[in-house]
């Protein structure tokens, strides 16, 4: 709605898709004929910054108002509803017709009558348009992938930017404005081998965790690789490119970040490439490349004996629930999805990032499930989720099960959490640890000091179960053991690292550190990146010689050693079992 956008084609247009696929295939055939022996794969780019999300996703304007969008929208409605009567019933509008349906107005898309969530009772058209936009972007990516696959005769890798399901939690207009919540559709394509993104632009600086934008472990479960674009601003970077605020000013700090990033990729089975985003020689220092060479000590044994990354902690996101987030809902999803990767990274144990449907399909096996957006589940999905996570600890974030299909339901929330829930009116979403919470190690208050709607409390939590309280005294964080395992309800948006540590201890998760530290681990390999000055008490869980892989020196015997570390320092270690 911000006027013509000549830079981007309309992905809903069958003409664009046809022509783009044909021309892409022609380019690939030409390159294969002339230079095929030198090419390992193809990485088509398009839309905003080449990353296949709608133009101006991070800004105020709304996409979707081109003529081709409207034609595609009406075709999609016809496929979804079959006839006008079905559409009229769904939209509760006796005057609407598939052939004349209009794109929801900017005012309708910016409205938020239900607060955080779109209300299906009055916003069905807006919800449908959000789903339409996800499918159009995902299907365009898949069609172009097929063109590359066929033109290369199946001999080359096919790569795309897509699936930033954690990163777009910060979008004010709602995450779905991006078009990236069709990740499952893209993962189902046999024509895509690698998905990628930059390292998150949140928490990527010195002392930070450099988190993934996506449900990276679900990408691996789909038998695809996640590729990090490491555009870390080295000490040689100039200008204000994305992430400029986190730039460093020395080669020593640069190398600590680069080693952290490569180490994380190694233990999580990611790929990575160093990207000179400014095109001015960011990596033009042999000392950086010497560090990359030293990282062979971690890469080579993992290549020789690959190990699946199956962490005890799973951070889980549901695409459908994110599509339901309204304009302004980032008051919840920014702290609760985008920023939550900071405390997850610091809690002292490695974590994986997954889609909810992988959990319900029993493809994920964790001791602790952090269910960040399990907000919109029908009865079958709730039963499958409880069955798949039976015996584990579940962290239920913000509004678990609030929508039973299309209807708000406190009973559905109770079924999931085991707590009788109550909806609060005009309460700020801020949680202060109680005396019981402090006994378990909680020190940090968290949430937002502004009112959000809806907001929930555990109405029947006892004082012994209440770990943190809202300003009105009601239970904001509550822990209870039931027949399905431990249930931790967290009402305010966001989490704290000390809360996650307490939950991990309850769940039987192995903690490598008992204080904040960025930890990445897989099998005998551990990468630490210090988030603060001071000694790190490391517990590798088994006896054996602990070795610094970058120097080759033995530094102690496990399972427990103390490492003096400075803020931003990275250590790459292995344990040789005795």
Label for each model-derived stretch:
Residues 159-339, 424-456, 467-471, 475-479, ...:
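Hydrophobic targeting/anchoring helices
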Residues 363-369:
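Short acidic/histidine-rich motifs immediately flanking catalytic phosphotransfer sites
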Residues 1-194, 198-201, 208-209:
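Polysaccharide-binding and catalytic clefts of secreted carbohydrate-active enzymes
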Residues 154-156, 222-224, 389-394:
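A short helix->loop->beta-strand "cap" motif at the edges of active sites that frequently abuts
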Residues 180-186, 343-363:
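A short, well-structured beta->alpha microelement
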Residues 254-255, 372-578:
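A conserved amphipathic helix/loop scaffold
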Residues 52-53, 205-207, 236-238, 282-285, ...:
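Extracytoplasmic/secreted cell-surface and envelope-processing proteins
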